[in-house]
Swiss-Prot record:
Belongs to the universal ribosomal protein uS7 family. It comes from Pinus thunbergii. This is Small ribosomal subunit protein uS7c. It comes from the Eukaryota. Keywords: Chloroplast, Plastid, Ribonucleoprotein, Ribosomal protein, RNA-binding, rRNA-binding. One of the primary rRNA binding proteins, it binds directly to 16S rRNA where it nucleates assembly of the head domain of the 30S subunit. It holds the Pfam family Ribosomal_S7. Part of the 30S ribosomal subunit. It is found in: Plastid, Chloroplast. One of its GO terms (biological process) is translation.
Amino acid sequence: MSRRSTAEKKTAKSDPIYHNRLVNMVVNRILKNGKKSLAYRILYRAIKKIQQKTDKNPLSVLRQAIRRVTPNVTVKARRVGGSTYRVPTEIRSTQGKVLAIRWLLGASRKRPGRNMNFKLSHELMDAARGNGNAIRKKEETHRMAEANRAFAHFR
């Protein structure tokens, strides 16, 4: 039995403008090479673009996009007796949210064009509507989990 106490869960801080933890989680995922001010600028411009295009609350669009992309199950590779099985496992809501943010940003980076805030805003709007590459990624993951349901007992 370990003598160490369990580590406390770190809670995400809220961002300076919207005072929202979800916005800060997205900013930390956009971050490259420690340029946080650039990451904030990209997200805030994307949010402004969403507001101009949809006339809705951009934070609700962001929340809805993340909710739509968040997966319920994922597949993990598990090695049993020399062969590798893709085992479907349920994931917690926080891990699902992290995966959703990662997929949204990956899909927006792959979009054609040069401007990241433009690509991110369009990907968020598409995901909120229920289409886009991030939604496709979620559906693909769910299909993989459904196809490998026979291996669920390997958990």
